[in-house]
Amino acid sequence: MIWNWLRKKKKSNTSKLNETDNQEQHSNNQEDDNKEQTRSMKHNKGKNNEQKDSSQDKQQSAKQGDSSQDKQQNPKQEDSSQDKQQNPKQGDSSQDKQQSAKQKDPSQDKQQNPKQEDSSQDKQQSAKQGDSSQDKQQSAKQGDSSQDKQQNAKQDEPSQSKQQSSGGNSIYDFTKPEKDRIHSLQNLIEKLKKSSDFVNYHTSDDETMPYWISYYRPSLDGEKLQKYLMPTLLERPNASLEELKEHIPMSGITITNDLQKIEDMVLKGHAIIQLNQQDQKCMLANIAIDNYRAPTPPLNESTVIGPQEGFVEDIDTNINLVRKRLPVLDLQTKEMIIGEFSKTKVVMMYLDNLAEKDNVDFLEESLRALEYDQINDSAYLQELMGEKSIFPLYINTERTDRVTKALIDGKIAIFVDGSPSVLLTPVSYFDFFISPEDYNVSWMYATFSRILRLIAVLFSICATPLYVAVLNYHYELIPSDLLETLILSRAQVPFPPLIEALFLELAIDLLREAGARLPMKVGQTLGIVGGIVIGQASVQAGLTSNILLIIVALSALASFITPIYKMGNAVRLLRFPFLAFAEIGGLFGISLGFIFLFTHLFRLTSLRKPYALFYPTRQQSVKDSWIRFPLTMIDTRDVQARPQHVKKAAKGISTKHRSDFDD
C-alpha cells in the first residue's frame, strides 16, 4: 500500500511539472543540493544514462516520469535506510539534506507548499538532465568527495564511541555489566554462594524464627563464633539488631545496609547476620582468625648488639610496634587501598610536627595514583613509584629501631599489609651504609665501620676490572717481583683475562644463588664446600690463576658488607659493566665508567630530594653520614628530608672536673 501511495504521489507531482517548466532557474541557485544527490546518481549510473537519453524529448519525459521516478525511488530508499542503520549517530546537516531529497515522507509533503514541491522536482530533473560533460565530471568529483567525507565520518565514529565508552576511566576498566551488578543483599549472598567455601544457613529449623548467618568457612575463628556470637543469638530470638549489638561481647560490630561495605567486610572475614532472609539491613561481626606470626629477629639485618625486634606480615602489628616506641600524638597515619584485585592495605606513617608537608602530600598523591592488579610486598611499590635505577631509592627494612630513627629525622614510612618490610623515604646514598648497630657502639668504632664499608664497596667494584686492565694495557705498573709470580700463575691459563674473570665471577654468583635457595644448613655447607672444591679444581685444571681466584673471593666478601641487601645487589651488578670498560680502555675505561656512575648518582632523586649527599654539600649531614660524631654533637636532624625542625635535643653529662664529687 505504501508503494501505491508513493506512485500516486509521484504522478501528481509530474502533472504539476508541466505547468511550472519556467522554474528551472532554481536549479542553478541550489548547487549544494545537486552535489548531495550525485551520490545516488553514481550508484544508479546505468539507469541515469537511459533517463538522460530519454529526457531530450520533453513530451516523453512527462510520460516516462512515473516509471523513472519509481525505479529510482527504490535504490534511494534502500540507500537511505542503509545509511540510517550504519550511521545512527551522524545526524549532520548534509545527510539531513540528502535524506530530505531522497525521501519525501507524508509529513514533509503536507507541510511544504506546492511551490516547494515543484522546486524540489525541478532540482531532481536538473540533476538528472545534466547533458553537458562538465556537469557530469563535476558531479562525479563531488560524489567522490561526498563519499570520502561520509567514509571518514564512519571511521571516526568507532573511535569516538570508544572514547565515550571509556569515559575517561583508567586503563584497568573493571566496570561490571548491568546484569552482574549487585542491587540487593540477596543478590550479593547468591553471588557469594557460588564459592564452595561460603556458608549461608538459618540458626533454627523453624523458618519463622530470625537470624540468618553467612560467612567464609576458611577465615572462621570457631571460638569467636561458638563462644561469643551464637549464645547471644540463641538467648535473644526476638531482639533487634541494635539490641544484639549491645549484648554481643565482641568489638568491631557494625550495622549497615551499604552493599559495598558489606562485600568488603565479608571478604575480610566478617559474618553477615540478618533477622530475616529478605532484609536489606544486616549486622557485621568480625569472626576472622587473628593468629599471626609473632615478632622475630630480622633475618636480613641481623646485628650483634641492639634490639632484635623485627616486623611481621600483619600491618596492624607492625604499626603497634612503632607506636610502642614513639608514644606521641604527632605520630600520624594515612591509610589507602592499592591493587585492583588484592585490595592491599597501605599505610603512610610520619611525625606531623617534623615531616615536610610537601613530602607527605606528594607521596600520598603518588600512592593513590598507582594502579596494579596485585601488591604482594613493599618492593612492588618501589618499582611502581618510578625506581628505574640499579640503586635502591627507598630503604627496605625489617627493623623497628631503624624506622623510629627515620621518623624522628622527618622521613616517611610506608607499611604494606602482608609484607614484613617497611619503606623509608626520602633517603640518600650514605643511608644504605649506616647500620643500627653503629649507635650501640662507640662513635670511633662506628666511624671506622662506616669507612670500611665504603672502601669495601669500592674494592668490590674495582678489584676485578683493575686486574683485567693491568694485564691487558698497564702491566708495566706491576712490580717486578709480583709480575714474575703473576706470569707463572697464568702460564697454563689458555683464556684472556676477561674470560677468566667472568668465569670466576659467574661461579661465585651461582654458589650464592644456590645457597640462598636451599635450606639454611644445606646452603651454608654448599657455599663453603663448593667454593673450596670449585676454586681448587679450576686452578689445577688451568682454567684460572690462583691470584684472580683470591681477588674474586675478596670482592664477593666485600659486596656482602653493606647493611641493606638491595644495595649489595647493586654493587655486585656494577662489576660487570666495569669489566667491559676495563677490557676496552684499561684504566681510562675504568675512569670513564666512574664518570658515568657519578653522573647517574647526581641525577637521582628520592622523593624529589638529591640522592647523592656529597653534591650539593650539606655540612649539617656530615656529622652522621659516612662518619659518626658523638651523640652529644649530633644536634641537628638529617637535612635530606627537609624536616620542619632541624635542631634536636642532644645534651649529655659533662665529664669535666667537678669539685663537689671529687672532694
Curated annotation (Swiss-Prot):
Pfam families associated with the record: GerA (PF03323)
Keyword Ribonucleoprotein appears in the UniProt entry: no
Keyword presence, Acetylation: no
Biased composition (Basic residues): 1-13
Subcellular location: Cell membrane
Annotated keywords: Cell membrane, Germination, Membrane, Transmembrane, Transmembrane helix
Record-level GO BP terms: spore germination
Entry membrane topology: Multi-pass membrane protein
Biased composition (Basic and acidic residues): 47-56
TM region positions: 414-434, 451-471, 491-511, 541-561, 578-598
Stretches for region Disordered: 1-175
GO cellular component, one term: plasma membrane
Compositionally biased residues, Low complexity: 57-72, 88-101, 122-150
Function: Required for inosine germination.
UniProt family annotation: Belongs to the GerABKA family.
Protein's name according to its UniProt entry: Spore germination protein GerIA
Species assigned in the record: Bacillus cereus
Lineage of origin: Bacteria, Bacillati, Bacillota, Bacilli, Bacillales
